[in-house]
């Protein structure tokens, strides 16, 4: 009775900490496998060896032929399959129990810290404990979220369950096939020749074999479906976690690419300026103007000639003082007229 209570608690733990597909798989495992196998397996396969007869009186021939026909009993083979398939789930359940015990220790330590008087140290220690609790992914009602290391454990258990299911299906096909033949031809020592052996209730056993085959295929399908579900869930969680690190305005919209002109952009390094574009032509002719220094030399030579003509006695090299002395109005007007004429003639020569 105590063993059944322990098994019931174990099943409750597995049911509580599994996905929806995992719960369906567990129901298929225990209802359609263990229950059916326990109730009908014994009645169908109870006379498996006693009713296996061969048409020979050679001692030991029937036993060796039975051993060759059935290396392992179907019922024992299915029990072994159940043990292998359920073992990864037990490992996952052990991880869940470990996390639950760890959370209980953290809660106990937190309650002990709250009883202390030093508030600062207590708050720091409680903050550290809360961070550790968050890493355990345990909710307030005691259920564990399948995240982090627990997700990898659950994913590994589903992978191994799928491998075991497929392996046992291949093993059953290799050992027995999926149809129970009524006559088995045996040729083995110590049988003197080929011996015909007869199986009891072959049709009933064939139906039972096909039923267990369908249950195994359903279990394998659920495992593969749950594996795809977990992989998609992990990818979505990783994408959401990655999108949190990308800034929202990393890629601005087209209308936000170029900011509007405001007073704040007056000191920007690049400002909009208006330019006048002149048409360019290869045959453009520009007027010939003298440079300012050439014009100054012309004016200087003209004034020098006027000074020489006005005062022949004092050359240019000896009138340094008289050149800066005040001139009478009459003389000034004469010089001005002469300079005007000279400049006009020079201008005419220039433009000619």
Curated annotation (Swiss-Prot):
The chain crosses the membrane at residues 24-46, 77-99, 154-176, 209-231. Keywords: Cell junction, Cell membrane, Gap junction, Membrane, Transmembrane, Transmembrane helix. InterPro entries: Connexin, Connexin_C, Connexin_CCC, Connexin_CS, Connexin_N, Connexin_N_sf. Residues 332-352 are annotated as: Disordered. GO terms for biological process: cell-cell signaling. The keyword Transmembrane helix applies. Pfam families: Connexin (PF00029). PROSITE patterns: CONNEXINS_1 (PS00407), CONNEXINS_2 (PS00408). It is found in: Cell membrane; Cell junction, Gap junction. Coiled coil: none annotated. One of its GO terms (cellular component) is connexin complex. Residues 340-352 have a biased composition (Low complexity). It comes from the Eukaryota. Expressed in ovarian somatic cells, heart, leg muscle, liver and eye but not in brain. PANTHER family: CONNEXIN, GAP JUNCTION ALPHA-4 PROTEIN. One gap junction consists of a cluster of closely packed pairs of transmembrane channels, the connexons, through which materials of low MW diffuse from one cell to a neighboring cell. Belongs to the connexin family. Alpha-type (group II) subfamily. A connexon is composed of a hexamer of connexins. This is Gap junction alpha-4 protein.
